[in-house]
Structures are given as structure tokens and as C-alpha cells.
């Protein structure tokens, strides 16, 4: 299934992050907590400004981002994969290689 977000919405797939405890034990899954990093899968056309113009989004498909995993971020299952739908304003940073 193909999904196309509207306006300033962004579709992100959460990246799993491996964590280690203070004792060096590798934590995975729920013990490691949810990652707030992900890869952008799709972006909307942009935010509609008060004057009616459309401002393109700063993020693009393929960007790795750090996001705020709170109110307003919606999890959905698409083709048996969980993706997150959020506004661009929920994205805090783009991770540059």
C-alpha cells in the first residue's frame, strides 16, 4: 500500500536502537525503550501559511530524524509495518552522516 501524507505531515519508520546497561548488557526491545529516531518514508506538500502560500518541508524522504514521541504522533500499521504519522514540527533534528 502506498501512503501520501497531507500538508505538513511526515511518515516516519522508527529505527531500532541497541542500548547497553551500565553493566554492559545489551538491552533490546522494551527493555531498551522506544527509539526517537527514524527514517522519513514520505512527506506532504508543505505547510499552508496564513497568506495561502505553501512552504515546502525541510525534511525529505530518506532523512534520518530525531523526533518528539509525544502527543500528536500517531502510530499506524501499513503492510504489517508500524509507521508514525507526525507534523514536521514534531521533528527536532535531521541526523547528518
From Swiss-Prot:
SUPFAM superfamilies: GroES-like
Keyword flag Transferase: no
InterPro entries for the chain: Chaperonin_GroES (IPR020818), Chaperonin_GroES_sf (IPR037124), Chaprnonin_Cpn10_CS (IPR018369), GroES-like_sf (IPR011032)
Alphabetized UniProt keyword annotations: Chaperone, Cytoplasm
GO MF terms, alphabetically ordered: ATP binding; metal ion binding; protein folding chaperone; protein-folding chaperone binding; unfolded protein binding
Pfam families referenced in this protein's UniProt entry, alphabetically: Cpn10
HAMAP family listed in its UniProt record: CH10
Stated name of the protein: Co-chaperonin GroES
Organism name: Yersinia pestis
Amino acid at each position: 500500500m502506498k501512503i501520501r501524507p497531507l500538508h505538513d505531515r511526515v511518515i516516519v519508520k522508527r529505527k531500532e536502537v541497541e542500548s547497553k546497561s551500565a553493566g554492559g548488557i545489551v538491552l533490546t526491545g522494551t527493555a531498551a525503550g522506544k527509539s526517537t529516531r527514524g527514517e522519513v518514508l514520505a512527506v506532504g506538500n508543505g505547510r499552508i501559511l496564513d497568506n495561502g502560500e505553501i512552504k515546502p518541508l525541510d525534511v525529505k524522504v530518506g532523512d534520518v530524524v530525531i523526533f518528539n514521541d509525544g502527543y500528536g504522533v500517531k502510530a499506524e500499521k501499513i503492510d504489517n509495518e508500524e509507521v508514525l504519522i507526525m507534523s514536521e514540527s514534531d521533528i527536532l533534528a535531521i541526523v547528518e552522516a
